[in-house]
Amino acid sequence: MKAISVLGSTGSIGTQTLQIAEEFPDQFKIVALTAGKNLDLVTKQIETHQPEVVSLADESLLPELTRRINSLNEDSKILKKPLLMAGAEGLNTAAAWGSADLVVTGIVGCAGLLPTLAAIEAGKDLALANKETLIAAGPVVIPALKKSGSRLLPADSEHSAIFQCLQGTPWADNARLSTGVPTPGFKSIQLTASGGAFRDWKAEDLVKATVEDATSHPNWSMGKKITVDSATLMNKGLEVIEAHYLFGLSYDQIEIIIHPQSIIHSMVELDDSSVLAQLGWPDMKLPILYCLSWPSRLKTPWPRLKLTQIGNLTFKEPDTNKYPCMELAYSAGKSGGTMPAVLNAANEKAVELFLEERFKFIDIPKVIEAICEKHKCDLNLNPSLSEILEIDNWAREEVLDYSEKNIKKMQF
């Protein structure tokens, strides 16, 4: 049985991970949970999974959670009360929890960086759903992985697809250890993108896009932030940077293709012109399950893919005029150093302000480009962890400053 720590248990990745654990109780045991403010949900999770440690983001909520846990214990609904913690200390403790074999990092944004490093330093294997960790701190995370021997298993659908395609090839060991894919015989990877909420919109109509429009994904069920990232195609741009670090590829070896049906999750092209692809229904539980069960595969009762029912699979190149965030990500990745951290932080803050209706959808790439341009003169090609965290804070403050100075022309 594999013991699992779930960081971000009440979010999209976390809840799906726990659903899988419930479906396979003889395979997975949840030993640690971290959550935000959803006490009702985390209380149910504690009752169902009976973890050894639970951490909340907000320390002020601990007394109420303690009361609820005491009630569960008195009613014999849990056998043993978990250790309760809060804040950064609790998050890092859960990430490095002694009995955990695998840590699922489902925390959104750069907040997942420090607990990810804590898990790596403790020698834990990682199911990485928090792409921002590698994007912002790849220069720190990859050396830490190599030093500790921790294995990094990608939990998002596209990188999981690449990872699965590489199994059974000469590059399998390199992929799962994040030591890079050797060049001989290996040509490129192709990351597929659904096109997001606005794939059928004309570029000139995006000026009218609302928050409700941007958070309505045609294929996937995800959180609001990542759904907006899908609409701007920044999500795919960030995945390009993530793939660079995961598989040791140059940016010229990573291509983005629009595939509206989201059935082919990504492809690997070899030097002999062969293409390996991984197919499946657009369901995040599939790549999460593969991370949890790897190197084995578990039989599921889930719907089977029947290509005859789908009929057509279509593909097209992304429109760079419609999706400027994609090119911003390529540019930041090629610049290297602290630029991806600036891109990521600026995007996180810009999306947050858009969701608050502080400015328009079309302003997201404008803000990000302005902040990245401002950072060029201070680019650090070999940053430390503290320098990455500092530049992350700087970029967020710059987005706020930019929005305040331009608020009148940016508002809905």
Swiss-Prot record:
Identify the residues that bind Mn(2+).
D156, E158, E239
Quick one: which residues bind 1-deoxy-D-xylulose 5-phosphate?
Answer: K131, S157, E158, S194, H217, S230, N235, K236, E239
The catalytic activity of this protein is classed by the Enzyme Commission as 1.1.1.267
Q: Which reaction does it catalyse?
A: 2-C-methyl-D-erythritol 4-phosphate + NADP(+) = 1-deoxy-D-xylulose 5-phosphate + NADPH + H(+)
Q: Which GO terms describe its molecular function?
A: 1-deoxy-D-xylulose-5-phosphate reductoisomerase activity; manganese ion binding; NADPH binding
Member of which family?
A: Belongs to the DXR family.
Name of the protein described by the UniProt record: 1-deoxy-D-xylulose 5-phosphate reductoisomerase
Per the record, the gene is dxr
